[in-house]
């Protein structure tokens, strides 16, 4: 597998630090509002990358943080006359709801800044001891002139950055590019005690400290949206490598912008849509399909026309799946023909081709193209005369490859809800001593391959 490394600006063979294991960190949201679908693209990409790595046999530990204390959170809390904690906790819950609608699974660890302040303080102390940071009136700054490799991720040298800097004048700083590690407390704002007085962490230090705590001094993959290359990820490298003396991350992955009218979608430009707004008109699996239909590094212009096209493409895949399910349910052909055995053997070509294109810098667009090639082949070959084994093989390959991308999961979710609804109806019928209806529901589910088990903990179900 090769991945494009932002640090080297080239594709590199992926070799994890520990064979068979991957440690991956992606910068998560600042939780002061609902995230927009530009953020959603990044969440979808890292979710799909994680799924693919697991599919390829890696044991993945994925960490995605929540920035739950920040100027924007404090401002929102003041506007609503509530605590910053109330705002952040509310939007963490909403994040999980919206992420789930996009098919994004929870990370293995979702650390919060406010729960890791002691580790952040200890990290800052190490930087002070190494003389790469300095304290001024309760604020602590990182001295970028003390880190020789500053600018290596964004491919800019210090002189260029300083001459082009549009940074507000701060006489307390030694250099215009120096950035804050610890902010002294302001009246009415959340704060923590530290060796430099009461205050709170700066943005960049949070991820360095949490990545080190949960994944170690060097991690395999780090990334996020393309807008984080500079200054956020550049500053993370400076902090972490100055602190440990080791490479911070071996592979840096950045997701291209989602644009509206060729301008980056952002809250500051007020040109964004949230998943909730898109969900008023579209199934959000179509949005996931849309995001994965382009290479993750390519900037994508969002439009309803393109989303309609994605919706149609996804419907083709669902139609193929439903067609196979229908044949499987109705076919009486048990014995395989010799030609079917050969065709089943040929299906491995699709998984091999899927792996080949996906291994080339996680090319989900080409991966989806392979899936459509499979569907065309299936539609030609699988008819009502096909044997059960041939249909099962085709179905298994389709579900396997789409599952890697987190697609075609709707039936599973709908099935869970439908079974739950029928179990409740059966329970109500039993309470009302309507045993005829109760038995009818049980028999109906049995016909669908669902077996109910009455246990002391309630009714449980399983597929036959």
From Swiss-Prot:
State the Gene Ontology terms under molecular function.
ATP binding; cysteine-tRNA ligase activity; zinc ion binding
Per the UniProt entry, the Enzyme Commission number(s) are: 6.1.1.16
Q: Could you tell me where this protein is found in the cell?
A: Cytoplasm
What is the reaction catalyzed? tRNA(Cys) + L-cysteine + ATP = L-cysteinyl-tRNA(Cys) + AMP + diphosphate
Motif 'HIGH' region extends across: 29-39
What InterPro entries does its record include?
Cys-tRNA-ligase, Cys-tRNA-synt_Ia_DALR, Cys-tRNA/MSH_ligase, CysS_C, Rossmann-like_a/b/a_fold, tRNA-synt_1_cat_dom, tRNAsynth_Ia_anticodon-bd
Which positions does the motif 'KMSKS' region occupy?
264-268
Keywords attached to this Swiss-Prot or TrEMBL record, sorted alphabetically, are: Aminoacyl-tRNA synthetase, ATP-binding, Cytoplasm, Ligase, Metal-binding, Nucleotide-binding, Protein biosynthesis, Zinc
| Cofactor remark from the record | Binds 1 zinc ion per subunit.
Question: What GO biological process terms does the UniProt entry carry, in alphabetical order?
Answer: cysteinyl-tRNA aminoacylation
Residues that bind Zn(2+): 27, 207, 232, 236
Q: Which superkingdom does the taxonomy of this entry point to?
A: Bacteria
Can you tell me which residues bind ATP? 267
Predominantly, its location class is cytoplasm
Which GO cellular component terms are attached?
cytosol
The family annotation for this protein states: Belongs to the class-I aminoacyl-tRNA synthetase family.
Question: Partners and quaternary state?
Answer: Monomer.
User: What name goes with this protein?
Assistant: Cysteine--tRNA ligase
To which species is this protein native? Alkaliphilus metalliredigens (strain QYMF)
């Amino acid at each position: 597998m090769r991945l494009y490394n932002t640090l080297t600006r080239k594709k590199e063979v992926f070799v994890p630090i520990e064979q068979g294991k991957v440690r991956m960190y992606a910068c998560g949201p600042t939780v002061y509002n609902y995230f927009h679908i530009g953020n959603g693209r990044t969440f979808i990409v890292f979710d799909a990358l994680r799924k693919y790595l697991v599919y390829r046999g890696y044991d993945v530990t994925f960490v995605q943080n929540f920035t739950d204390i920040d100027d924007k959170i404090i401002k929102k809390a003041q506007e609503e006359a509530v605590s910053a904690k109330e705002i952040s906790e509310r939007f963490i819950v909403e994040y999980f709801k919206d992420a789930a609608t996009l098919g994004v699974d929870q990370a293995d660890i979702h650390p919060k800044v406010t729960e890791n302040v002691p580790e952040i303080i200890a990290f800052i102390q190490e930087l002070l001891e190494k003389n790469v940071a300095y304290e001024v009136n309760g604020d602590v700054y990182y001295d970028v002139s003390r880190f020789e490799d500053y600018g290596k991720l964004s491919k800019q040298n210090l002189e260029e950055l300083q001459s082009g800097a549009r940074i507000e004048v701060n006489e307390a700083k030694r250099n215009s590019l120096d950035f804050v590690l610890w902010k002294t407390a302001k009246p009415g704002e959340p704060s923590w005690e530290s060796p430099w007085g009461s205050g709170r962490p700066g943005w960049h230090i949070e991820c360095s400290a949490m990545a080190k705590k949960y994944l170690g001094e060097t991690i395999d993959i780090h990334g996020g949206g393309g807008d984080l290359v500079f200054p956020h990820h550049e500053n993370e490298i400076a902090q972490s490598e100055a602190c440990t003396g080791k490479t911070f991350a071996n592979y840096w992955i950045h997701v291209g912008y989602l644009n509206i009218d060729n301008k980056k979608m952002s809250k500051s430009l007020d040109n964004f849509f949230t998943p909730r707004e898109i969900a008023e008109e579209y199934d959000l699996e179509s949005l996931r399909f849309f995001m994965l239909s382009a290479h993750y590094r390519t900037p994508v212009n969002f439009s309803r026309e393109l989303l309609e096209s994605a919706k149609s493409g996804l419907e083709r895949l669902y139609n193929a799946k439903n067609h196979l399910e229908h044949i499987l349910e109705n076919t009486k052909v048990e014995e395989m023909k010799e030609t079917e055995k050969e065709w089943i053997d040929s299906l491995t070509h699709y998984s091999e081709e899927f792996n080949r294109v996906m291994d080339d810098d996680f090319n989900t667009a080409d991966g989806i193209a392979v899936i459509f090639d499979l569907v065309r082949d299936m539609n030609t070959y699988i008819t009502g005369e096909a044997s059960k084994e041939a249909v099962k093989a085709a179905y298994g390959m389709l579900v396997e490859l789409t599952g890697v991308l987190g697609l075609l999961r709707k039936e599973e979710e709908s099935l869970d809800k439908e079974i739950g609804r029928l179990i409740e109806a059966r329970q109500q019928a039993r309470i009302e001593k309507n045993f005829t209806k109760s038995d009818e529901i049980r028999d109906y589910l049995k016909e669908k391959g669902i077996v109910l088990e009455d246990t002391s903990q309630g009714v449980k179900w399983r597929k036959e």
